[in-house]
Amino acid sequence: MMRFSALRRLRGESHGSTIVEFGLLAPVILALMFGLFHVGVQMQRHNALRSIASEASRFITVEYQKANRLNTTQMANATIAIAVGGAYMLSQDDVAVDVQLAEDQRVTGAEEYTLTMTYDAPNWLTFIGVRDTTLSYSRPIFVPDS
């Protein structure tokens, strides 16, 4: 009987209910905030890959116009140097660049290369089961044919 009277008394008590409700909702709210931040960072990193590829394409094209013919390894190294440089500051361990001569040459008087970049993006959401993300971007590079 004593037990039921204590439960009846607690049922009408509202002090501390806010902290209990916050304790129940806080993990969800924090996960949503971290998720929103994570999506924003992933979008920024994807746009960085696009900008790096464009900047590398311009650099390689200008080098060819100066009669400095770069091989695919030099093109990849130049792209990595741009990626880890001041504007983008991507981790060199997480960036991979592959430059290959395209199988089908679409433009007469030019050589077409395919620049493919992959980036292992950092993941801050492993605590809620989000898997690691690898971002990838590919674009053609056209240089004057010699």
Q: How should each PLM-predicted stretch be described?
A:
Residues 2-80:
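Alpha-helical assembly-interface signal, strongest on the long, hydrophobic N-terminal helix that forms
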Residues 2, 54-146:
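Short, conserved structural patches
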